[in-house]
Amino acid sequence: MADRVMCQELATPGSHYRRPKTGVPSTNVVYANGGGSWRAAPRQTQRLPRQTVQQYATGTPATGSAGRHSGRAFATAGATEEQTVEFNGAAVMGLPATPRTTKQARNKSEEAINDLLTRIPDIGKLFDVHSRIGNGTFSTVLLGTLRRESHLPDSLRRKFAIKHHIPTSHPDRIMKELQCMTKMGGKENVVGIHCCMRYDASAAFVMPFMAHDRFQDFYTRMDVPEIRQYMRNLLVALRHVHKFDVIHRDVKPSNFLYNRRRREFLLVDFGLAQHVNPPAARSSGSAAAIAAANNKNNNNNNNNNSKRPRERESKGDVQQIALDAGLGGAVKRMRLHEESNKMPLKPVNDIAPSDAPEQSVDGSNHVQPQLVQQEQQQLQPQQQQQQQQQQQQSQQQQQPQQQSQQQHPQRQPQLAQMDQTASTPSGSKYNTNRNVSAAAANNAKCVCFANPSVCLNCLMKKEVHASRAGTPGYRPPEVLLKYPDQTTAVDVWAAGVIFLSIMSTVYPFFKAPNDFIALAEIVTIFGDQAIRKTALALDRMITLSQRSRPLNLRKLCLRFRYRSVFSDAKLLKSYESVDGSCEVCRNCDQYFFNCLCEDSDYLTEPLDAYECFPPSAYDLLDRLLEINPHKRITAEEALKHPFFTAAEEAEQTEQDQLANGTPRKMRRQRYQSHRTVAASQEQVKQQVALDLQQAAINKL
């Protein structure tokens, strides 16, 4: 029996979903093709048999030829066409028409619909599923409408995005995404959820549908006011998510939907979302961990006398352990002796105190039988003789060492090291002391650099567990460096990368196949010193093959934005020398007149004529892309940046001027100003007369 949770809003016919209000009121001015006013084409009506609907919705945008043409279809959203679509024998009237799709795309859409209806049969009882509108690694998004609203016209029918999770998705992943949308969704540009349906191992989310533009279709056509509105709404959504101490972890243009005509925004896809502890809880937790570690060290020091260091056990001790455990065979003694010579790869737990019941080699606790006790009493004289022989042998070995120390005092440090290695079992050169704390092992200096083997210090270190989830190209340096204590600054870096792509008109800006190349790309832009300092602050070590100076973000954005101008052959010819060569900067690998370095010594081509962004935009970009996550600006602080606040004040002033700019109000203002000036002149005359009278009185 399917577990089904339905909202009353869906169950009630005729009720309609109201789109969530954005953080910023929408404006009436809508830009098409970079500017101007929006004009819709005249409405046309025709009937197209068996046409698959391709619309934008929450999730990954459609790929292939369907994805390329769908942007054009939405660009003329006013010219919607009515059609008849047939799915599984059911005809749906009045859906918006789109260009024809290929046979392969149609087959994939039908396969996705059949898979959804097969795995969750109750979906077909409530919804008419029309087409696949997006797919990802862990889910597929389909377009659906309510069956009970099939009699309504297209303008009154509600559309839903049905996200079908693949059966192999982990339940925790589905639960986290459901919790995020339930707690945070439906406001502040964050996607909400209507209901969740489950059948056996399959689950589906029913979410509001929002038609949107593809990022690659509009990011080069946005002007400064539209860029400001886009980034403001993105930061509004991130601020709302971060209030719940949640990291989205997958902020990118395809997950931040934007309807350019209606100026609507929506942050979707919380499949990688992660809850983090607030800063106060993290600091208290770390303090508690330090206190617990200190208590453990104190207990270890107090129980040193009661513990039995395994690395100092001799052959006689190994035999004694075997006898205590009831294992007196020669085979067991040989096996124990071989195990005592093995080197541990990782630190193990401390040995239990002596007051605990004695354990056998296999770890079992039991009482010694009487026969074993009798054998122990018989073997005690033999054991004493063996111990005396071992002491005599050790004294004989120490005598020549003392003589050599007197003859060669310079070799004393080397002999001290030899004594330390001799104290380990079987004379091994590795330190096998298992009571070394984990902190000491992690802080130990590595000695295996540029060697063909791995040192024990590296083997004794704890494994680093750091989340690396996210889309390549949008992951910050702390994720690439595997820093375990990651915060919501991860999403702020991704927002900065989106801002950089818009300002430079380069999408995607970072594109690396692995983490090492991704770090190299960041080093190329921000320099090696910033990465080294950040790695040191995060207690990470990074090795770079060469040094690199940082680049100027303003030069970078304008050079890319007007790449056709600065890469013109005529411009290059004007800077060439007599022999036809042109000097190239060694750091940024650009011609000297196009040098992008922050501290460039070259006389570069002026950029003031091509400037299109205010200085506050570059300052905000620099703070969003701060390498050190502890110094990076938050979403709430970014919304208070002058790039947004100065524009809001200017807009408010313009609105006040427009409100007070009617002819009647202007005439009233001129009349009031004239009366004020006339009154002020009369007051001046009266004051002058009073001053003259006062002067005459003083003379008398």
From Swiss-Prot:
Its EC number is 2.7.11.1. Induction: Post-transcriptionally regulated by 20-hydroxyecdysone (20E)-induced let-7 miRNA. InterPro entries: Kinase-like_dom_sf, Prot_kinase_dom, Protein_kinase_ATP_BS, Ser/Thr_kinase_AS. GO terms for molecular function: ATP binding; histone kinase activity; protein kinase activity; protein serine/threonine kinase activity. It comes from the Eukaryota. Catalytic component of the Dbf4-dependent kinase (DDK) complex. Phosphorylates components of the pre-replication complex, including Mcm2 and, to a lesser extent, Mcm4. Phosphorylates histones, including H3 and H2B. Required for DNA replication and mitotic proliferation, including during the endoreplication and amplification stages of DNA replication in egg chamber follicle cells of the ovary. This is non-specific serine/threonine protein kinase Cdc7. The gene is Cdc7.
